[in-house]
């Protein structure tokens, strides 16, 4: 049975791997010249299995108003003429209640913890290396209010059996010795089972392993639309040619909604623009041990072999990929405060990418109203974290095997009207430029 996977980021590539392992004939199609050249290219590098939280959280609407006037705000909204932007923001606001936050976080933790197990199993099986570290995540709190607010997160972590530690200043320094000079840290939440790693390196190496296993990758291919007969997808237009298969997987990140919209599906995935800096380490003793998350700025500082990756922030600004000097200054501010002697900022590489976010934070994985069309998208800032679990979960669904975790709330049908039957048949679409 032939499957076309549309997209060669970390989500598309892990999907291809697990589908091939399940016995499918797999072809991956992408318009880039190679794998992991967009959102997966230079993300923060966190494998945040325990630190998994939706942006839609209690208190965020009030904070967002204040952030409008802050230079280094973690969230920025740039209103435009895009109705999808306003629809997505409204849905996000509706998820900023304690009840919805608990439901959404529980779903995300379920997938993230499963993904940790899948990644560990994959590493043991095929020995893939990606500058990974298994030394945990430390979430830094600069105010007592931030520390107190972590109580709800801790409750959900305990519910799912996720190990954690609440650290005082001495505990922070023990976990991350280079932070001994930093003043004003009131505490931290440490998640010892979290990991780090270079997402692009992982994806490139897994893609090669996919090829060795019989997966075909076709790059520099423009995907311009799906064609259906009302019940099934009959093909996808690629470089002006109709490509056919038995099943189709859409793993195009923020560009997924444009592909399925002409089929009558309104997929609530919107790009959250993020930024990163990658700088060479100058003094290993003054660099991070693993991953630090600065709660005030929502910025992560991650250690690779000989590099530091600083990433974070979220801009609701459509498909704009321009680089913002202000955002660079925020990243430089955080790494200079925490690790002033750890790396060389003068040699830093600045990058931006679009994370495909849902308003509730949970990805969209699984079946659609079309019997042979599947989605694997909407992971937001956690695509790297959830990639292996999402790929394995999808392969199990498509193989009619019982997934190892609950399927509750993971597919598009949780949005009600967004899972309705298609209104138009045999239509195509044109994706936004990227």
Curated annotation (Swiss-Prot):
Belongs to the DadA oxidoreductase family. GO terms for cellular component: cytoplasm; plasma membrane. Pfam families: DAO (PF01266). One of its GO terms (biological process) is D-alanine catabolic process. This is D-amino acid dehydrogenase. It comes from Stenotrophomonas maltophilia (strain R551-3). It is an enzyme of class 1 (oxidoreductase). The gene is dadA. Keywords: FAD, Flavoprotein, Oxidoreductase. Oxidative deamination of D-amino acids. Pathway: Amino-acid degradation; D-alanine degradation; NH(3) and pyruvate from D-alanine: step 1/1. It comes from the Bacteria. PANTHER family: D-AMINO ACID DEHYDROGENASE (PTHR13847:SF280), SARCOSINE DEHYDROGENASE-RELATED (PTHR13847). One of its GO terms (molecular function) is D-amino-acid dehydrogenase activity. The lineage of its organism: Bacteria, Pseudomonadati, Pseudomonadota, Gammaproteobacteria, Lysobacterales. SUPFAM superfamilies: FAD-linked reductases, C-terminal domain, FAD/NAD(P)-binding domain.
């Amino acid at each position: 049975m032939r499957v076309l996977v549309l997209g060669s980021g970390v989500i598309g590539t892990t999907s291809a791997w697990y589908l091939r392992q399940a016995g499918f004939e797999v072809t991956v199609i992408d318009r880039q010249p190679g794998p992991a050249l967009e959102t997966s290219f230079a993300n923060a590098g966190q494998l945040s299995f325990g630190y998994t939280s939706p942006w839609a959280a209690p208190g965020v609407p009030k904070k967002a108003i204040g952030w409008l006037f802050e230079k280094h705000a973690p969230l920025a909204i740039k209103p435009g003429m895009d109705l999808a932007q306003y629809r997505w923001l409204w849905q996000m606001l509706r998820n900023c209640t304690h009840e919805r936050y608990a439901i959404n976080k529980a779903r995300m933790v379920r997938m993230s913890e499963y993904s940790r197990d899948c990644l560990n199993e994959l590493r043991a099986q095929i020995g893939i290396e990606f500058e990974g570290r298994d030394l945990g995540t430390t979430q830094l709190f600069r105010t007592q209010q931030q520390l107190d607010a972590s109580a709800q997160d801790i409750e959900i972590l305990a519910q799912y059996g996720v190990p954690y530690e609440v650290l005082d200043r001495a505990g922070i320094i023990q976990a991350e010795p280079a932070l001994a000079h930093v003043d004003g840290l009131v505490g931290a939440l440490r998640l010892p089972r979290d990991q780090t790693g270079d997402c692009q390196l992982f994806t490139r190496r897994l893609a090669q392993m996919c090829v060795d296993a019989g997966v075909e990758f076709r790059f520099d291919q423009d995907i311009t639309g799906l064609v259906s007969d009302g019940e099934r997808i009959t093909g996808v237009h690629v470089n002006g040619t109709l490509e056919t298969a038995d099943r189709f997987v859409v793993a195009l990140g923020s560009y997924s909604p444009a592909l399925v919209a002409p089929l009558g599906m309104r997929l609530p995935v919107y790009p959250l623009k993020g930024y990163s800096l990658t700088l060479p380490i100058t003094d290993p003793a003054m660099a991070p041990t693993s991953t630090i998350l600065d709660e005030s700025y929502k910025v992560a500082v991650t250690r690779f072999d000989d590099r530091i990756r600083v990433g974070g922030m979220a801009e609701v600004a459509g498909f704009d990929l321009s680089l913002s000097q202000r955002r660079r200054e925020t990243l430089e501010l955080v790494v200079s405060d925490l690790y002033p002697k750890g790396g060389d900022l003068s040699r830093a590489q600045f990058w931006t990418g679009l994370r495909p976010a849902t308003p509730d934070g949970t990805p969209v994985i699984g079946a659609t109203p079309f019997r042979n069309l599947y989605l694997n998208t909407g992971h937001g800032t956690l695509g790297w974290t959830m990639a292996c679990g999402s790929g394995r979960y999808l392969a199990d669904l498509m193989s009619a095997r019982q997934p190892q975790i609950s399927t509750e709330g993971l597919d598009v049908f949780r949005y009600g009207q967004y899972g309705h039957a298609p209104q138009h048949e045999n239509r195509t679409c044109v994706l936004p430029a990227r």
